[in-house]
Amino acid sequence: MSNQIKLLVGLANPGLEYKRTRHNAGAWVVEELARIHNIPMREEAKFFGLTGRIQTNGQDLRLLIPTTFMNLSGKAIASIAKFYQIKPEEILVAHDELDLPPGVAKFKKGGGHGGHNGLRDTISKLANTKEFYRLRIGIGHPGHKDKVAGFVLGKAPTKEQELIDAAVDESTRCLDILLKDGLSKAQNRLHTFKAE
């Protein structure tokens, strides 16, 4: 059974200084999809972000990269969801994931925020529902929680970045499977992928 996902969000911090930092990995998924479909992402003040729209597998899919800071992402997501009457379970949020290594990505439905401020605010602004889909892009972990802030706001070394980029590419391919054939088939493919 297919999933009626109507909104894909890529979490990020705004500004050039953050563009290639690990915390912006979610936005790279949306940027890659927009590039593949050759559509521009436009600033939309009422949605506090960059928006676009693509057609994939006969479905309309709205794209959003919030231009709020990460910890205010929910404001942008809630605004566009309310305007287009998109339910939480029709939203897929792509985000960086400390608990997965670079080169790995996983789909998930529901769950907590795992300390991710973008997810925390999204859950809060969607009336505390956790039932949206997530696309977790592995960035690895610095080894100690005290180093996390500097790590996520830093740029990955070239080899790690290549692994993350490969996982982003595979994620965009598996998104088509998610939309067409459902979560378990998309998970079966994406969860066996590991960039080397």
From Swiss-Prot:
It holds the Pfam family Pept_tRNA_hydro. The record marks 96 as: Stabilizes the basic form of H active site to accept a proton. Disulfide bonds: none annotated. TRNA binds at residues 18, 69, 71, 117. The record marks 13 as: Discriminates between blocked and unblocked aminoacyl-tRNA. Its EC number is 3.1.1.29. It is found in: Cytoplasm. It catalyses: an N-acyl-L-alpha-aminoacyl-tRNA + H2O = an N-acyl-L-amino acid + a tRNA + H(+). GO terms for molecular function: peptidyl-tRNA hydrolase activity; tRNA binding. GO terms for biological process: protein quality control for misfolded or incompletely synthesized proteins; rescue of stalled ribosome. Keywords: Cytoplasm, Hydrolase, RNA-binding, tRNA-binding. It comes from the Bacteria. GO terms for cellular component: cytoplasm. The active site is at residue 23. Hydrolyzes ribosome-free peptidyl-tRNAs (with 1 or more amino acids incorporated), which drop off the ribosome during protein synthesis, or as a result of ribosome stalling. Belongs to the PTH family. Monomer. This is Peptidyl-tRNA hydrolase. It comes from Aliivibrio salmonicida (strain LFI1238). The lineage of its organism: Bacteria, Pseudomonadati, Pseudomonadota, Gammaproteobacteria, Vibrionales. The gene is pth.
